[in-house]
Amino acid sequence: MAKMTKIEIQKRNKERVNLFLDGEYAFSISAELVYKESLKVNSEINPEKLRTLAESENFMRCKESALRIIEKTYKTEKEVRDKLKLKEYDESSIDKAIEFLKKYNFINDGNYTKIFIKDKLRSMGSQKIKYTLLRKGICKEIIDEELLNLDKENEKDVAFDIAQKKYNLIKNKETDTYKISGKLYRYLISKGYNTEVTSQVIKKVMAVDVDDF
């Protein structure tokens, strides 16, 4: 069993503390953990206590990293996990950090999905939105539930505006209506609109142009 012979606050980082066991430097931990665990000079530390300290320290560092990750932009659970794994934190610490973030609603895949859909509907179709969210680690059930509430007519209106702008660019270089329709079709599909919406929108765009003419 080792004895705690010195607890030294680091000069460059007052939130970190160096621990000395039996007269020799052992490792450093956060000052918060020293107070939390009531560590004192001359106290005896058994191997189990050392292991617990190491685990607690890893978790605290992992949690701090997780908070920095979400500091500027809202993230999905998968995005946070992936970034923590890149920093080589152990799975147990990552799980605890994620649990902490969820507890205080710092990450919420349901809320993220709502915000993402509302924002991206102005520039892409529901299929691309779904694919993008799946890649971000959002479960299919959450995505499908939110997309069910989607205003289909609003999606068509947005698709029409996008298609109209593209059409105005294409018709300056192309006069063949069949080729124009083909280019519009591929463009809208690439934007994530399904075949039904795409076909309806193209017909409307072409019809509007004929009426204007």
From Swiss-Prot:
Listed GO CC annotations: cytoplasm
Keyword Oxidoreductase recorded: no
InterPro entries named in the record: RecX_HTH_1st, RecX_HTH_2nd, RecX_HTH_3rd, Regulatory_RecX, WH-like_DNA-bd_sf
GO terms under biological process: regulation of DNA repair
Compartment(s): Cytoplasm
Pfam families listed in its UniProt record: RecX_HTH1, RecX_HTH2, RecX_HTH3
Statement: the UniProt record of this protein carries the keyword Cytoplasm: yes
Keyword terms of this UniProt record: Cytoplasm
Family: Belongs to the RecX family.
HAMAP family, per database record: RecX
Function, in words: Modulates RecA activity.
Matching PANTHER family: REGULATORY PROTEIN RECX FAMILY PROTEIN (PTHR33602:SF1)
Protein name: Regulatory protein RecX
Organism phylogeny: Bacteria, Bacillati, Bacillota, Clostridia, Eubacteriales
Gene: recX
